[in-house]
Amino acid sequence: MKQQYLLDYEATKASKNGMPVCKFDSCIPALQFCKENGIKMRGHVLVWHNQTPEWFFHKDYDVSKPLVDAATMERRLESYIKQVIEFCQKNYPGVVYCWDVVNEAILDDGSWREINNNWYTIMKEKYVEKAFYYARKYAKKDVALFYNDYNVFLPAKREAIYNLAQKLKEKGLIDGLGLQPTVGLNYPELDSDDIDSFKTTLETFAKLGLQIHITELNFEIKGDESNRTPENLKKQADRYYEMMKLLLKEDTDNGGPCNITCVTVFGICDDYPLYKNFKQCMYLWDKNCNPKPCFYSFLQAGLDWKASLLSK
C-alpha cells in the first residue's frame, strides 16, 4: 500500500479541489483475503521517500513545474492519509491492525534523509510529525502507529530514532517502533558471542515504553546460487536461531524489558522477486517453497526456549 500503487495520476490531475485521488485496485485482493480468513494486516506504508511518484510533489501535479510549497504539501499529505486509512476502515474493518506511518526517514549517521526526499525538501523534518498527526486523527483508537527503519543497531541512528520516538510519544502520536533486521550473514556479526549491538538497541528502545515490532527479519546469503552451500545455509540457520533466542529473552512476556508484540519475516520464498531481476536467498523457504534449515532453526529457538522454562 504505497503511493506509487495507490495514487491515480489521471484522476488526480482532473481533481476539482486540487487534492490527490486514490485507487485501491492493487491492494483490494489482499485486504479481501485477510477479511475472509480472519487475518490481520500491517499497513505499509503511508509516507516514504521511495516509491512515491515525483509528480505528487509538483504544482498541478506536473513535473515540469516547481515543487509546491509546504502548506500545499501538507494538505496533500492529509488528504492522502485520510483516504487510505478511511478506505481500509470502512471496507475492511478490523483488518489493518497497525500502520507504518513513516518509513526510513533517518540516515545511518543519525541525520535526516534529505537527498532524494521531496518530503524533506518541501516540509523539512516537520513532515514526519505531521504524518503521525494525521494518521492519529483518522485511524481508530485500536490501530497502532509505528515508525519503521533499518540499521537500527548503529549508535548514531539508534539515538536519532530514540529522540524522534520520544518526541512523538510525548504528543501521543506513536505506539511503537518497527525494527528491520535486514542484514547479511556477517553484518552485523549476530552470532552467539556477539549480538550486543542489537541487544543494546532493543533495551534502549524499551525505555520508551512503546511496542517493538521486528519487521522484515532476514539474513541474506548474497551472490548467485553457487553461494547457497550447505555451510552457508547452516550459517543462515544459526543466525535465525540466535536472533529468535535473543528476542524471546528480551520480551516482557519472558521477563525481559522489551514489549515485542510482533516478529515478521521479510518474505516467504527465495527468488520471488521483490524488485525486477532482484533475486534473494534470505527467507525460510527455498524457491520451490520447501522449508530450509533456517525454517527449522527458527522454530527450534521457540521449542528450546519453552523447554528451558519447563525445566526450571
UniProtKB/Swiss-Prot annotation:
Q: Which residues form the GH10 domain?
A: 1-301
One of its Pfam families is Glyco_hydro_10
Q: Which UniProt keywords apply?
A: Carbohydrate metabolism, Glycosidase, Hydrolase, Polysaccharide degradation, Xylan degradation
Domain of life (superkingdom): Bacteria
Report if keyword Hydrolase is assigned. Answer: yes
Q: In which pathway does it act?
A: Glycan degradation; xylan degradation
Q: What is its EC number?
A: 3.2.1.8
Reactions catalysed, semicolon-separated, are:
Endohydrolysis of (1->4)-beta-D-xylosidic linkages in xylans
Can you name one GO molecular function term for this protein?
A: endo-1,4-beta-xylanase activity
Active site feature: E104 (proton donor), E216 (nucleophile)
Name any Gene Ontology BP term: xylan catabolic process
**Does the entry feature the keyword Hydrolase, yes or no?**
yes
What is this protein's function per UniProt? Could be a xylanase.
Q: PANTHER family recorded for this chain?
A: ENDO-1,4-BETA-XYLANASE A, GLYCOSYL HYDROLASE
Family stated for the protein in its record:
Belongs to the glycosyl hydrolase 10 (cellulase F) family.
Protein name (database record): Putative endo-1,4-beta-xylanase
Q: Which organism is it from?
A: Caldicellulosiruptor saccharolyticus
Lineage of the native species? Bacteria, Bacillati, Bacillota, Bacillota incertae sedis, Caldicellulosiruptorales
